[in-house]
Amino acid sequence: MGRFRGSITKQSRREGINLAETEKVQKYLDRRPYGPGQHGQRRKGRPSDYSVRLREKQKLARLYGMNEKQFRNLFEEASNVPGVTGTVFLQLLERRLDNVVFRMGFASTRRQARQFVGHGHILVNGKKVDIASYRVKIGDEISVAEGSRSMGFIQENMDAQKRRRVSPWIEMDQDNFKGTFSRLPAREDLALPINENFIIEYYSR
């Protein structure tokens, strides 16, 4: 499974969840709560246990914009860490720099966050980091580079973020275009429409 680069709205309809986590895509899903294409509204037969687990794995990987190799490697790492594997796995996903940039509201989607990171618009503890998969640590300060703060996209995103609830594991200083990753998110903090146990079962088969 490579990284999906097509329409995020169409892919969200196929997976049945809001992969972009934006109001725009959610409104579209509310209007068309079925798969894309001329056969999207047809009732399908009961899926097999394998296909249910495969689809759950694909949904989570696409939600975070990862290819199969990245996703599998991260899962294997989570499996070797003490604790609840599913929760540890989700925490590792949440610690990706592109995801933290998205959570802080600097970018409107994770896809846009990856672009911002890759183009050098994001700093970690005052230093430029251009690797989307960089793992953010507790206490790290993430900020927008001084020269990038006047960009129209970033200004619009920050204005929109002021109207939304900030993730409880993040402390924001929106006026100064920065935030701190203050703690690991608990499972109940993450409103993800995902059953991570299915993913554990998929990789354990």
UniProtKB/Swiss-Prot annotation:
GO cellular component terms, semicolon-separated: small ribosomal subunit
Keyword RNA-binding: yes
Annotated keywords: Ribonucleoprotein, Ribosomal protein, RNA-binding, rRNA-binding
InterPro entries xrefs: Ribosomal_uS4, Ribosomal_uS4_bac-type, Ribosomal_uS4_CS, Ribosomal_uS4_N, S4_RNA-bd, S4_RNA-bd_sf
Annotated GO MF terms: rRNA binding; structural constituent of ribosome
Biased composition (Basic and acidic residues): 12-33
Domain S4 RNA-binding intervals: 95-170
Record flagged with keyword tRNA-binding: no
A biological-process GO annotation: ribosomal small subunit biogenesis
Region (Disordered) residue spans: 1-51
CDD domains hit by this protein: S4
NCBIfam families found in the cross-reference section: PRK05327.1, rpsD_bact
PANTHER family, alphabetized: 30S 40S RIBOSOMAL PROTEIN, SMALL RIBOSOMAL SUBUNIT PROTEIN US4M
Complex formation: Part of the 30S ribosomal subunit. Contacts protein S5. The interaction surface between S4 and S5 is involved in control of translational fidelity.
Family indicated by similarity: Belongs to the universal ribosomal protein uS4 family.
Function: One of the primary rRNA binding proteins, it binds directly to 16S rRNA where it nucleates assembly of the body of the 30S subunit. With S5 and S12 plays an important role in translational accuracy.
Name used for this protein in its record: Small ribosomal subunit protein uS4
Gene: rpsD
